Amino acid sequence: ISIANSLDIGEQVLLSPNVYITDCDHEYRNIDVSVINQGIVQRGQKVSIGGGSYIGINAVIVGNVKIGKHCVIGANSVVTKDVPDYCVAVGSPARVIKNIKS
């Protein structure tokens, strides 16, 4: 977990091994300076994971993202956009493939 601003994880969220969560990016404006020495971009972003959600192994959650309650994020998925409540999202980038309540 690499958070510069805000992370909210609801109750009974299951994080599988090797899940990576971040709300910031690295600067990359000068090709003569290594990325690690260019600083971190903080844009007031917030990551939120709703209660009862399950985040699969090796999933990556990046940026200003809200994962709703009782969601399933598939293994190896890269979440870059919001996932509504009760949805299953998979892939890179992750996309919703099912609404559990439907």
Q: Where are the regions a protein language model picked out?
A:
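Flexible, glycine/small-residue-enriched loop-and-beta-strand segment within the central core
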Residues: 1-65, 92, 100-101
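Short amphipathic alpha-helical segments
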Residues: 85, 101-102
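C-terminal/domain-terminus segments
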Residues: 61-94
